């Protein structure tokens, strides 16, 4: 269960290879308003400065802790480094926010959950912790197989929806 009234309840929202600029802009706005960090995993289906993405995100870009990662492996390494830094290890953490951002850094819990049509567990039956990562796939094809494999079936969740519909729009 997510407790949105608790100000410490913040997550990492991860978009793997997003394709539609306005959807990503809307998620930027969502993250700015909820205090979540946003991670974009390349390749993106558009340039990071795409006008439609900026327009959909309104003026919230500077209030979002957003990081663009070259690929899934780079993202995982970055998150492991941030955990090591938080625990006092010698490794340097990659910042989870741009230098101009007013957003605060969000610690990583070490737990990643993919939301996928191939998931079997409901997120409503799960207790999320601050710092958890919620991983979403491409708008047209969902989470790539390698990402699903790295998460494992116990960490794939399925949002309830009608049986023959293929996806929900996270940005709505």
Model-derived segments and their meaning:
Residues 1-172:
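Post-transcriptional modification and biogenesis factors for structured RNAs
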């Amino acid at each position: 269960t997510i407790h949105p009234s608790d100000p410490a309840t913040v997550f990492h929202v991860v978009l793997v290879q997003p394709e539609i600029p306005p959807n990503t802009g809307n998620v930027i706005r969502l993250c700015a308003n909820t205090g979540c960090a946003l991670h974009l995993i390349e390749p993106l289906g558009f340039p990071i400065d795409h006008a439609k993405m900026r327009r959909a995100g309104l003026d919230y870009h500077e209030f979002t802790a957003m990081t663009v990662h070259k690929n899934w492996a780079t993202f995982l390494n970055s998150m492991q480094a941030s955990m090591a830094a938080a625990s006092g290890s010698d490794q340097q953490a990659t910042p989870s926010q741009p230098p101009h951002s007013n957003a605060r850094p969000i610690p990583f819990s070490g737990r990643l959950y993919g939301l996928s049509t191939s998931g079997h567990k409901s997120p409503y039956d799960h207790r999320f912790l601050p710092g958890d990562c919620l991983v979403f796939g491409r708008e047209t094809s969902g989470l790539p197989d390698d990402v699903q494999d790295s998460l494992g079936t116990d960490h794939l969740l399925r949002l309830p929806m009608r049986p023959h519909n293929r996806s929900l729009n996270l940005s709505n």
